[in-house]
């Protein structure tokens, strides 16, 4: 995510269908901060980010996208357009072609506000008319799937399979390994999705090595891509799971009062002192999954760079 403070600030209350804790990390992440974060966290490594806006506020979508495009052109890096479902096919195509985006980012909070969280379907914020445009242009869509059932939800699985079958030329990426942060989020999803030929998962903001292992075994390392989800993964935290739910362990007081957030738990003392960055926890879990699935050096290079480079049309 790449955004300026004055653009994302809004008096409007956050959509209740969204997790609240990611907003605790940074109220701004301009391109300069993003590039410096990569330089500091990955010394000696060349990182090519694919940038897109923060997902709110909706009434500043034009400014959010314009800033990202300006940054992408200045730094010669790929970018995704934050797209709204009410845009016509013609409007979406014009924005994509004129401004040279590599695809779109869509989000469940753009579904009609009258729909409760568990009644939102993928097509409510990624309509078929827009899928047809992406298919015709051969572009990518970064999809954060809805519903509390996450990856195992049968409605989600049904629509993912429909998209795979009906739009063979677009590049569908399921963010956060389909939001399967816990093993209980998976169900029989990978048994179903291993029949797909193009569907891709990204690892971003997920630290479940077992889920990563299942995903790699289901679709292969050529359909997995590394993502940072910065600035969210700049958090000092470690994720655990309890009773089928994820919990973010953070140093007491570092992110203000988190007592009312069921996804957060504060810790103190030596345990808190040992906490690293969320992004390092993600990479540690990728490493564990890579060892357990016996990936070779070339396959690891693919999932950290080559696969995304190819999918975004950069190779």
Predicted regions and their residues:
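Active-site neighborhood of phospho(di)ester-bond hydrolases with catalytic His/Asp-centered motifs
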Residues: 1, 50-52, 80-82, 105, ...
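An N-terminally biased module of ancient metal coordination in phosphate/nucleic-acid-related enzymes
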Residues: 1-54, 59
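Active-site environment of divalent metal-dependent phosphoester hydrolases
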Residues: 3-6, 56-59, 86-89, 110-113, ...
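Short, flexible/disordered intra-domain loops and linkers
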Residues: 7-24, 113-121, 151-152, 183-184, ...
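Active-site gating/metal-coordination segments in enzymes
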Residues: 48, 56-149, 195-200
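Distinct, well-ordered alpha-helical segments
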Residues: 61-69, 89-97, 150-166, 181-193, ...
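H/E-rich (His + Asp/Glu) clusters that bind or coordinate divalent metals
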Residues: 177-315
């Amino acid at each position: 995510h790449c955004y300026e403070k004055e653009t994302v600030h809004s008096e409007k209350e956050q959509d209740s269908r969204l997790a609240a804790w990611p907003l605790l990390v940074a109220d701004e992440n301009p391109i300069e901060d993003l590039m410096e974060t990569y330089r500091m966290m990955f010394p000696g490594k060349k990182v090519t980010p694919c940038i897109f806006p923060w997902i709110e506020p909706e009434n500043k979508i034009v400014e959010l996208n314009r800033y990202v495009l300006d940054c992408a052109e200045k730094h010669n890096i790929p970018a995704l357009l934050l797209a709204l479902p009410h845009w016509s096919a013609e409007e979406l195509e014009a924005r994509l072609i004129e401004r040279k985006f590599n695809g779109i980012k869509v989000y469940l909070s753009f579904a009609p506000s009258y729909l409760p969280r568990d009644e939102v379907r993928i097509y409510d914020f990624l309509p078929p008319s827009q899928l047809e445009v992406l298919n015709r242009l051969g572009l990518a869509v970064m999809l954060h799937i809805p519903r509390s059932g996450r990856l195992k939800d049968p409605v989600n699985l049904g629509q993912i399979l429909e998209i795979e079958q009906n739009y063979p030329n677009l590049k569908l990426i399921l963010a956060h390994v389909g939001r399967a942060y816990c093993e209980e989020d998976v169900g029989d999803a990978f048994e179903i999705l291993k029949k797909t030929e193009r569907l891709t998962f990204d690892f971003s903001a997920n630290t479940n090595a077992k889920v990563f292992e299942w995903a790699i075994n289901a679709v292969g390392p050529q359909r997995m891509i590394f993502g940072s989800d910065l600035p969210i993964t700049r958090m000092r935290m470690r994720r655990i799971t309890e009773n089928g739910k994820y919990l973010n362990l953070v140093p007491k007081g570092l992110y203000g009062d988190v007592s009312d957030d069921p996804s957060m738990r504060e810790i103190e003392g030596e345990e808190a002192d040992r906490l690293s960055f969320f992004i390092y926890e993600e990479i540690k879990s990728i490493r564990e999954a890579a060892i357990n699935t016996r990936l070779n050096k070339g396959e690891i290079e693919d999932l950290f760079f080559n696969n995304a480079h190819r999918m975004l049309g950069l190779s």
